[in-house]
C-alpha cells in the first residue's frame, strides 16, 4: 500500500540538452528530482532480485533525474515509430563500456538540432517518455495537477523553437489524457523561455546573485554557449548572446 500525501500543484522544469536531459519538479517551495521510487524499478520477468528491469531501459540510479538524449529504436522504418517503449526507448547504458559495445545503428542522437524526419520522430518519442515518467513522479509526490516549463537556446532557429514548443504543448495534452494527471488550471500548460532568460530568472529567484549590482551568466551546453548580463535586479538581461559551438 502506498500512501500519497496531497501536495500543491507541480511544475516540471524540462531541460532538454543535446547530450543529456534533466527534469526537476517544484511543489510549492520544494524542489526535487523528477525521479521514480525504487519499487517502480522492479522486475519484468522472474521473481528474483537478479532480474531487475534496469539494463538499458531504466537508469540504475533510483534518484536519477537526468538521462542521455539518445533513443534506441527497435526497427529501421521510421514511419512505424509510434509507441513509447514499444518501438523504441531512451537508452540508459549501465556503463561507458556498455555504450561503446552497443551497435550504433540502433541508436539515434542529435535530436535537438536535426531536421530529418526520422530524428523528429525520435524526438517526439523521447519527449513523450520523459513526460510520462515525470507525470508519474508528480502523481506519486502527491501533486493534483501539473504544468511544464521548457527552454531553448537563442541560437536555435526561430522556426525550430516554435516547432519544439508546439510539440511539447501537444504532448502535454496527450500525456495528461493518457495518464489521468490533469494539466494545471491555474497556470498555462506549457511556459517557454530562452535559456538565457531561464538561467537569469532562476538565479534571481534563488537570491544567489547580487541584485543591486549585476551578474554574468554562462551556460555551456553540448552545442551552444549562452551568455547573458543581468544588472540592477531587473527581470530581463541587459545584454545576451547565444553562440554555436
Segments from the language model and where they lie:
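Phosphate/ATP-binding catalytic cores across multiple sugar-kinase/actin-like superfamilies
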Residues: 2-3, 122-141, 196-211
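Gly/Thr-rich phosphate-binding beta-strand-loop-beta motif of the actin/hexokinase/Hsp70
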Residues: 3-31, 204-238
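Short helix-terminating capping/connector loops at secondary-structure junctions
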Residues: 6-7, 138-145, 180-187, 209-212
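Generic recognition of stable, solvent-exposed alpha-helical segments in well-folded globular domains
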Residues: 16, 118, 122-125, 159-163, ...
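Short glycine-rich, Thr/Ser-proximal phosphate-binding strand/loop in the N-terminal lobe
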Residues: 28-57, 77, 233-245
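Eukaryote-specific, cytoplasm-facing alpha-helical/coiled-coil scaffolding segments in long proteins
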Residues: 47-48, 158, 226
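Conserved phosphate-binding loops in N-terminal lobes of ATP-dependent enzymes
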Residues: 49-152
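Glycine-rich phosphate-binding loop and adjoining helix at the ATP-binding site
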Residues: 150-198
